[in-house]
């Protein structure tokens, strides 16, 4: 009887763990990633719908005549622990990479997904057509930049 009870408890535990993993938010799987698009991201009825939109809309190259509008879905690797993060642009065509600009974004301390539509950047702000930029979601913690997510884009 003791053996049956142990097997039953092991099966319940395994089922619970497996169920929790399969139903875990996919933000954890995409954590540390930024998807950038030239089309705005909307709201999605399901995770499947959101993933399809991310695949369809995600781009790494953006065309413009000195100005570009970027829309981002930011999947933080961990909650920021603060009320603000910075979206920072580094020109990686230069050595060493040079910080060009940043945008401060309000978040909840435990927030894992940040949707940021309509971010206008231009040559007037220091961006150069033909250059590559690393886009980072960061926060300064203890005097050091902590990176929660990043991607690389090219402006054409």
Language-model segments: which ranges?
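C-terminal segment of classical bacterial N-terminal signal peptides
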Residues: 15-26
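Sec-dependent N-terminal signal peptides
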Residues: 6-15
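Short, compositionally biased P/S/T/A/G/V-rich stretches that sit at domain boundaries
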Residues: 26-70, 156
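Short, exposed beta-strand-loop hairpins at the edges of beta-sheets
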Residues: 78-79, 123-152
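Intrinsic-disorder/low-complexity, polar/charged segments enriched in Ser/Thr/Lys/Arg/Asp/Glu/Gln
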Residues: 67-73, 148-150
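Solvent-exposed serine/threonine-rich low-complexity stretches and specific carbohydrate-binding patches
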Residues: 97-112, 152
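Extended low-complexity, serine/threonine- and proline-enriched intrinsically disordered segments
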Residues: 78-99, 137
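Short, solvent-exposed, Trp/other aromatic-anchored flexible loops in extracytoplasmic proteins
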Residues: 68-70, 77-78, 106-132
């Amino acid at each position: 009887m003791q053996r049956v009870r142990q097997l039953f408890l092991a099966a319940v535990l395994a089922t619970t763990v497996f169920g929790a993993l399969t139903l875990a938010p996919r933000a954890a799987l995409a954590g540390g990633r930024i998807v950038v698009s030239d089309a705005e991201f909307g709201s999605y009825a399901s995770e499947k719908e959101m993933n399809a939109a991310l695949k369809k809309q995600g781009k790494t190259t953006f065309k413009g005549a000195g100005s570009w509008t970027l829309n981002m879905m930011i999947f933080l690797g961990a909650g920021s622990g603060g009320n603000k993060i910075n979206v920072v642009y580094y020109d990686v065509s230069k050595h060493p990479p040079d910080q060009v600009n940043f945008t401060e974004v309000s978040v909840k301390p435990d927030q894992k997904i940040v949707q940021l539509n309509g971010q206008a950047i231009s040559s007037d702000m220091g961006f150069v057509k033909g250059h590559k930029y690393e886009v980072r979601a960061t926060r300064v913690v203890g005097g050091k930049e902590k990176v929660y997510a990043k991607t690389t884009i090219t402006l054409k």
